[in-house]
Design a protein with these regions (language model features):
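Nucleotide 5′-phosphate-binding alpha/beta core
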Residues: 1-69, 73, 118, 122, ...
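Conserved AMP-binding/adenylate-forming
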Residues: 163, 169-282
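AMP-binding/adenylate-forming
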Residues: 43-57, 70-136
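Adenylate-forming
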Residues: 107-114, 124-170, 174, 183-192
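Secondary-structure boundary elements
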Residues: 60-67, 93-96, 121-125, 144-152, ...
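AMP-binding adenylation
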Residues: 111, 142-147, 158, 232-240, ...
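Short beta-strand->loop
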Residues: 73-77, 159-160, 248-249
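Short, aromatic/basic amphipathic alpha-helical patches
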Residues: 84-94, 142-145, 167-176, 364-370
Length: 421
């Protein structure tokens, strides 16, 4: 089942438990990253389920039983799921004997910085939660405003999209201070279910080793964008057609073998650990004892454009830019699309936003375009063949824009793929 043949085919009441919305306590909506937003009924019971899954993360990785914690929820509030979900689940975790104070400034840089400045000194640590591009912006904005992140015991809980290891390294350098594996944690979720899986020190260490290893441990492991561990008792995955993920979960709408539109795979803990000898150098002191199955993601199958019949994936472009020597001069936001020229040829276009204080220049535009052209050929042999076949017409057309030009709507994921004009 999927959104088209199940969710959109029937009324909201028909697909809800017992054919009614009476068991629901509130509504959340999807971000609309792949289509029109949709409303999802949720209950307090499902928030408690999420709380149970997040509790080991808080207590074992963030040590919240012993460490007083200021949790700053900078996910979008309102009807969008993440803000309320993490607010409710974290309050439940606090009620289980964890010294956590929860604040919810939402997607507001100034308010987020104001609350962290006001309360961080009263707690042993700060956990800042939000969408990766927004949190990166908060960190940069805070540094400019004089916030000494390096003097603060701050951890980041990020959700909404996977993060690459170069991106993690870049953000750790912006934060300064300890470079611990548990300092930046990415979580995976969907509007349909809320929270699904999270990174652990073990999954992060394995992901970093995989990127540097020639060992063939997972199918297409060079494409892995997210590497998590999950709780199969409450989030059960199956893989069909090689890399299509099906999820069964207790949500506001019953989901049975639901097609997530994410591609990837699952791996048994014991099977992965048997391969550990191939992955030398895992820091045993940090990985802990996370005996849970692994979930790896290549990305959403629909976050791409078709260029001369080739699929050009957002994830590959993000990875290329994050590995560039000029990444600090970029905000991290871009859009991609394929346009038709006056000669009816296709043209691959990127609009890339610069970081605060940077101005577009012809020289910089040329550098970015050449770098992307080179990196995309490294990523895709098909694109390399296309470059040979059509020459300069395969070269990306890059437009650099000042900071703030690419706007994001609060609560909605950034639309990496723009519509053609």
């Amino acid at each position: 089942m999927d959104k088209e043949n199940y969710i959109a085919k029937y009324s909201l009441e028909e697909v809800s438990w017992d054919g009614s919305l009476r068991s629901a306590n509130y509504l959340s909506s999807s971000s609309g990253s792949t289509g029109s937003p949709f409303f999802w009924p949720r209950s307090a019971r499902q928030d408690v389920i999420v709380g149970h899954m997040l509790q080991p993360l808080f207590e074992r990785m963030f040590d919240t039983k012993k460490t007083t914690t200021f949790f700053c929820d900078s996910f979008a509030l309102g009807t969008w799921i993440a803000g309320l979900l993490y607010y409710n689940a974290t309050k439940w975790i606090a009620d289980q004997g964890n010294a956590i104070l929860v604040a919810s400034p939402g997607i507001d840089k100034e308010e987020t910085i104001r609350e962290i400045r006001r309360f961080s000194s009263s707690f042993d640590q700060v956990i800042l939660a939000g969408y990766p591009p927004f949190i990166k912006d908060v960190i940069s904005f805070g540094k400019e405003a004089g916030v000494k992140w390096e003097d603060m015991n701050i951890r980041l809980l990020l959700g909404g999209e996977s993060i690459s290891e170069p991106w993690r390294k870049n953000l750790l350098s912006l934060l300064g201070g300890p470079q611990s594996l548990a300092r930046i944690i990415s979580v995976y979720g969907m509007a349909e279910t809320g929270f699904i899986a999270h990174e652990t020190p073990l999954s992060i260490a394995l992901k970093q080793e995989l990127s540097a290893s020639s060992a063939d441990i997972f199918p297409q492991q060079e494409k892995i964008a997210g590497f998590y561990q999950y709780y199969p008792a409450t989030r059960y995955f199956e893989v069909v057609e090689e890399d299509s993920l099906l999820l069964t979960a207790d949500a506001g709408i019953p989901l049975i073998r639901y097609y997530t539109r994410d591609s990837g795979g699952i791996a048994d803990y014991a099977a992965v650990m048997r391969q550990k000898k191939t992955l030398a150098g895992l820091p045993a002191a940090e990985v802990g004892n996370w005996q849970m199955p692994f979930l790896y993601l290549y990305g959403r199958k629909d976050l791409s454009v078709s260029f001369y019949a080739l699929k050009m994936y957002v994830g590959n472009v993000k990875s290329a830019l994050e590995q560039s020597p000029f990444y600090s001069q970029l905000s991290g936001l871009f859009t991609m699309r394929v346009e038709q020229t006056a000669n009816f040829d296709q043209r691959l276009e990127f609009t890339i936003e610069l970081s605060r204080g940077q101005e577009p220049s012809e020289h910089m535009t040329h550098i970015v375009a050449e770098f992307l052209h080179h990196k995309l050929q490294e990523t895709s042999s098909e694109y390399t063949k296309l470059c040979t076949a059509i020459g300069e017409r395969a070269t990306p057309h890059v437009t650099l824009v000042p900071y703030g030009t690419i706007t994001t709507v609060p609560g909605k994921k950034h639309k990496w793929v723009a519509a053609s004009t």
